[in-house]
């Protein structure tokens, strides 16, 4: 067996600095990603609660369809970060190329699936006042799959090589474009026709097209500055590498699909409880999702740093990188939980002043405050495991805690016990809490094993 690199143990501050250097831009990128959906919701707010519910439901359904393609491309985190840690830049470029080819192959079936999902809305018992406007919004949004998947492939490639600022700039500028396009297309300014909710969907398409174009140019310019050898690499389709990428990505896609699928069904259940319940559910969920973007971004930083450490043969360093990512995420989650408890109505008033919706949303934010720490733990631990090449453990965890515990308990409390949308959220939070505990345990076992292996091997 090859000797394991055992460097001097860095101080906690020494671990924190590189984690934050990577995590902060990635977190801001994740927030920028979420802001695009928030902007859509805010911009249609004057159209009424039905419009808020329709855009919220449409975004959840879109991301349910999007999850498979997005998740498969997460395999690039493992391949590129480990190759970069080992100093094999050509391997990074070749993996990126396979990701781009795969993104092209995934876009068309994803678009078709989006249209099929919209045809199911009446059969799912969705209020016609919500189902009607949801359909044109999703139809427009479906055209963003191709630029979206291309952006994801380029983003994972650049981030795994510690290139994060270009990704952040792409998101910030795309949000500005999306905001302006919403103003023009929803309400018919500058002489263009008033498209209503559909205009919000088309605005997002425009923003995502800008993102992939910006990132493609950024990748080329970065390679020229660093003489990274992108144009000298063999970028032809590589079926062996493609199979490896898919093998890593499919469980990651299933992990995401299982969680997003639960919240998609939760939105459907909330819609059956009435317009006010759905609006409160969507606003509270969107606020919780905004704060979730921080640990989600930290999880990417954890995956990259763990993968890079493994690539250079530093298993103890991989363990320390993963634990530092979890610590950073928990610190933030503590603050967001406190904010939800202390300022619920102030946060919800961004969306609406409807008293019934505010009351429901405030109660749901109190529940969200409880599961913040566990939700942060589960997503960051899953990222750490992904950096190590383990995408199956998080997938199996999500299957059990969400589909065999969280959703059944939520449905029972909401409909059988008559607790409504509050009962639904209590069930979902149970699954999130269990998921955090299970994945924390899985990561702890792996980190202990690495320490033991390092202690039994000669240092180099």
At which residue positions do the language-model features occur?
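Short alpha-helical transmembrane segments in multi-pass integral membrane proteins
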Residues: 1-26, 80-146, 177-184, 192-250, ...
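Interfacial/gating helices of multi-pass transporter permease domains
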Residues: 21, 44-63, 129-133, 197-198, ...
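Transmembrane helical elements of multi-pass membrane transporters/channels
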Residues: 21-40, 140, 151, 174, ...
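Residue-level hotspots within the lipid-embedded alpha helices of multi-pass solute transporters
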Residues: 30-34, 67, 107, 111, ...
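Helix-terminus/linker motif at the lipid-water interface of multi-pass membrane proteins
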Residues: 31-53, 122-128, 184-195, 253, ...
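Alpha-helical transmembrane segments of multipass membrane proteins
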Residues: 38-42, 119-120, 153-157, 180-187, ...
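Small-residue-rich hydrophobic transmembrane alpha-helices
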Residues: 52-115, 151-162, 166-167, 280-343, ...
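Short runs within selected transmembrane alpha-helices of multi-pass transporters and secretion channels
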Residues: 73, 77, 141-159, 167-175, ...
